[in-house]
Amino acid sequence: MSVQSPLIAVPRKTTTDVDWATPIRHVIAASYGEDPNSYAEECAVLQRCRQDAVRGAGNDQTARDLLYKYFGQLELLELRFAEIKVSFPWNDAFTDKLTTQTSLAFEKASIIHLISSILSSLAQSASRSDPEGLKRAYYNTRATAGMLTYINENFLHAPSTDLSREVVHLLIGIMMAQAAEIFTEKLVEEKKSASLVARSANQTASMYTSVVDEMKEFQGKGVFDRNWLYVLQIKAKLFGSLAQYYKATSDSAAGKHGTALVRLKIANSLIQDAQKQASSFIYTFVAASTPSLPHDAANALNEIVKAHATVCGEAKEQAVKDNDLIYHEVLPSEASLPAIEKLPPAAPITIQDVYGNQEVTKLIGPDIFLRLVPLAVHESASVYSEEKAKLVRAEVDKVELAEGEIQAGLDHLNLPEEIDRWRQFLEGDTNDDVPLSQQLKSLVDSVGDVRQVENDLGRLDGERAACERELRELNGALDAESRECERMRAKYTPNFTQSPSGPQTANLRSNLSANLSALSSASTSDAHLQSLWQSIQPSISLLSSGPSNLERAARDITEGNPQKIDKTVSLLDLDDEEVDRKALGQEEKDALRKAVDDGREKLDRLKKIRAERDEVLRDLKEKIQTDDVSNLLLLNRRSQNVEPQLFASELEKFRPYQTRLAAAVSASRSILQELDMLVAQVHKGTGFREILRKEKDRQRIIRDWEKRLIEAGESYAEIRAGLGKGLSYYDSLRRVIEDLRMEVQRFTNSREQERRNMVSDIETRQRLGGTSPSTGGVVANRGLEERLAALKMEAPPQPPRLGTTSTPNLPPPPGRGSSNVTSSYLPPPPPPKPQSNPYDFSTLAGFGSFATPSVSSPQHVYPSQPQQAYNQQSYIPPQQNPYYPPPPSRPTYASPPFAPQQPPMQSGHSPYAPPPGHAPQPQQPQYPSSQNQQQRQGYKYPGYGQQGGYGGGYGQY
């Protein structure tokens, strides 16, 4: 064909601008609770997108692309603003009547109708003489039918004529008939078989005939252009004639000349009718009044019909001649002719197929309101994120488990160190250096100078001796004062009324006795420290000599040098043939060399597999991290129960990563098993097994030696801690002794002054009275003095019991307390408190003679009857004796009860018990001793949790 058959295009709908921004802002503020101003740019983009699609474009591909984009954005917009109300004005494509609705569905249907119009125009303008143009025309006509089909299936209530089901259905029929026409043209152009062309032409004629019948129902309604009907009628007869013509050609080729002649007559008759209509159509067609048809539609159609009429006429005349002269076949009737088969028509291209194209997806671009995600989509996305997290956790757990198995297996097999040792055995490059443990190296750095320990031990002995000497001197001072008092009493009986010093010094003697007892226990702890130091001194000296000497000693031990090894190492543990390692045989060397190569190769493979596995896991994590299905969830928001299937299909994207991880884990386990078998095979060798045995013995000896050194280091730390605590104890005890000395001196000085005053008063009265002591009294006094001189003081009283105070109760000052005793007379102290710990400072809270007396304390009242031990006369209170001198001033004892300040300990707490007589301190936690202290044989620390020693011993630190 030299002329192209005209095609009908769908008329275009028209519209005016709408306001998208205001309704969208209202919905964002009301439904999403966000700031509408933050989406001003998105609203402007949507507004421009509509203007470009419906106003600025023509009938070219650019217009089609803009409409594709706008409709795609409408689909996404409806997922977020389904109930939005915007006024959409559209003019009817056939009646030009304005229709305005606020539904998004009306806007979408109008845009699809406009897309179908653009597609039909593209099909109409395509050059079908070119194969590519013919394909585009065929595709666009089918796509137009698909768009119109979507309108009929999804928009049931048409607000305008052009969107009504009947009109849309007719347009679909026209588009499908034109698609069949284009396909028939393609078959003719490609010179396909006559029977195939006949079937296609018959199908096209049938479709045009059906459309003509449908269009006749709209006659007089002013919907369709009447020129459409002329074109459709002409084409129906034209393709009917073509079908008969090509069928006749097929029958003639099959030898059915009579049937072929009848069909040619039918074809000629149909084309003659079409030619008459085409001739009249030329005079009635006005191109300007029918923009949906090409401007040359009448002429082109007339030329096509005329050309086919000529062909049919010539073919009929030739067939008549041939039949009359040659074939002489009887011509069958037209009714008896078999019907021509119809070629099944092509299906319309659906809108899903159009938008499923990657190029169309790119045209649509990203969602304009991508930042605005509905809450339901957020919830579904969270569920999907949790599914992804489960997948990642499962894979990570598998990888970590596999890595743990690999690491444990390598540690169990001692790889790769074991392979290096095999290589050393082969090369004879055995390392005689003995590796020392990190704990032992740290111990060497912490030992320091041991001479300080010896100095501290000597200082400890000196402090203890000085404290004991001073305590005994104080006891002697109290004894001397008591003897002097009794001597004066015997001499001046009965006028000597000074109270006995025994009750007043009971508390002082109790404190002195308790401190002496604690000092005895401390001496035991000091002896224990000295003994412990002597037992570990060789080991500590070795540790303090430095790392180089320590390594040298370790080598001496492993080499079995009896002159150099540590005395703590048993010579029975050393092998006389340690140095002479048994050489491997040649066969074992070859096997070992092969094992070294195999082991290295397997370790390299294992390393690569682990690296690849970790890299795949990282890629999986990154892929899952960047995966986002919010858009898919938004697109499938209207579907019910789609999430499980959607999630399952999306998670399948990560299946390749899971497969690679599983393969890596399986390969690593296989290599680990091979390494295990390799090590076991090497260890089965006789020579190698003997070497391993000796190496194990060597390591055992070194470990035992290190263990003994470490235990010595722990004991050294205990000694240093005990020395610090012991010296601190003696410092505290020295302060307590100093306070006791001051109290004893104050007490003896006061008593001596009181005696001098009393003796002076007695002698003055005797001189004034001219009397002298009776002979019996003198004799008695002399006898008493002799007995006192021979009297040996007993041991001081026992320390006070727990829970009692060591503070004696002094009488109140004159005028405020009882008047029947002197101010220097003190009641007996409470029962002594037994000492549970020699360094327990709790007994210093109420230190004896330093406390202010309590008025409620019991007072001693001497009986009025003569006493055999001291006086022979009744006691005369000082207030009733005019010759008795005024009582001496009351000693200025410390108030509140004496509690000397303790020096702060290093850690703020002292586990040592303070000396007896010291103020009680809050009980401090006792630190448990290390486990090896209880297991150490050969010595045991005294006083650990027991009485005596330095308050539980020096071991508690």
Curated annotation (Swiss-Prot):
InterPro entries xref list: ALIX_V_dom (IPR025304), BRO1_dom (IPR004328), BRO1_sf (IPR038499)
Bias-annotated ranges (Gly residues): 945-957
Disulfide bonds: none
Skewed-composition ranges (Pro residues): 826-835, 879-890, 912-925
Biased amino acid composition, Low complexity: 926-944
Keywords: Coiled coil, Cytoplasm, Endosome, Protein transport, Transport
Basic and acidic residues: compositionally biased ranges: 751-766
Domain BRO1: 6-406
Superkingdom field: Eukaryota
Protein transport recorded as keyword: yes
Pfam families noted in UniProt: ALIX_LYPXL_bnd (PF13949), BRO1 (PF03097)
Ranges of compositional bias, category Polar residues: 851-871
GO cellular component: endosome
Region (Disordered): 751-779, 795-957
Coiled-coil region: 449-493, 585-626
Any single GO BP term: protein transport to vacuole involved in ubiquitin-dependent protein catabolic process via the multivesicular body sorting pathway
Localization, UniProt: Cytoplasm; Endosome
Described purpose of this protein according to its UniProt entry: Involved in concentration and sorting of cargo proteins of the multivesicular body (MVB) for incorporation into intralumenal vesicles.
Family designation: Belongs to the BRO1 family.
Identification of the protein by name: Vacuolar protein-sorting protein BRO1
Taxonomic lineage of the native organism: Eukaryota, Fungi, Dikarya, Basidiomycota, Agaricomycotina
